[in-house]
Amino acid sequence: SDLAFGHLAYEVDDIYALCAHLQAQGVTINRPPRDGRMAFVRTPDNISVELLQHGDALPVAEPWASMPNTGKW
């Protein structure tokens, strides 16, 4: 049977640092962490991955706060 799922999710220690690292490696940030709490990226295998800030959201910061969504997640 075919298994289907919407996305994977990971809790991370510093969502801004991880998103910056992934972006530097050429990963598209589909939904930037504008709120300091949540982001979505898409893997080269077309899997949507949700990143969640561990604990409280980080303070809202640029460049993330004004970055638009890219594609879909």
Describe the residue ranges of each PLM region.
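Vicinal oxygen chelate
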Residues: Y16-W73
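Short hydrophobic/aromatic beta-strand micro-patches
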Residues: A9-E11, R42
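Eukaryotic phosphotyrosine signaling hubs
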Residues: L3-H7
